[in-house]
Regions:
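A generic local structural motif
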Residues: 6-8, 53-55, 119-121
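P-loop/Walker A phosphate-binding loop and immediately adjacent motor/lid segment at beta-alpha junctions
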Residues: 86-91, 143-186
Length: 186
């Protein structure tokens, strides 16, 4: 698996400071995608052991809340197979830090309730390791810059442990100060 870029101390892809890994490879090709350069699976650099260790080290400080996986598309089967052991190791190293993942696939597709070519032998385990899944393709016509941690209004921020326990999608709950935020100056 290749990665397009890694952003350290990011604040746009989940709460607090995070390390964001943008994997390469995406078959969605959403019009208006902010990272279309990462559609190509061959783009970027190999996500090798040295890079993984650098990501792990970057998450060590207490002020880093966790890891965010973006793309490209983390849930392309080729990427899932590489990300699973990486996320497993991350959770073992940092059990109190969160893992957020952005996917153009929906929860229903990834869990097999709807047809999905991305579902493979590691999908369920990878989902279980996530804290939040931001699901759904970016839709240019639903683009809204006032949305926190997502680009278009069709995308959902799902609390994965609560979703798994409930057997249906459960939205992630933002801190109250941010949950009532609007861009209208209220």
């Amino acid at each position: 698996m290749n990665y397009a870029t890694i952003t350290y101390y990011a604040i746009a892809n989940g709460p607090c400071g995070r390390t964001s890994v943008f994997v390469s490879g995406c078959r969605h090709r959403c019009p208006g995608c902010f990272n279309s350069v990462a559609w190509d699976f061959a783009y970027g650099q190999p996500f090798d052991k040295a890079t993984r260790n650098q990501v792990f080290a970057s998450c060590q400080p207490d002020y880093i809340a966790g890891l965010s996986l973006l793309g490209g598309e983390p849930f392309e089967p080729e990427n899932q197979r590489e990300l699973l052991p990486f996320v497993r190791n991350f959770k073992a190293l940092y059990p109190n830090k969160t893992v957020w993942c952005y996917s153009g696939y929906t929860w229903e597709q990834l869990t097999g309730k709807e047809p999905c070519a991305a579902r493979c032998e590691v999908t369920d385990e990878l989902l279980q390791l996530l804290d939040v899944l931001v699901d759904g393709e970016f839709v240019q016509a639903k683009h809204d810059i006032s949305l926190r941690f997502r680009g278009s209004s069709n995308q959902r921020l799902l609390d994965v442990p609560r979703t798994l326990a409930a057997g249906q999608p459960v939205w992630w709950e933002d801190e109250k100060v941010f949950a009532t935020h609007t861009m209208e100056g209220n």
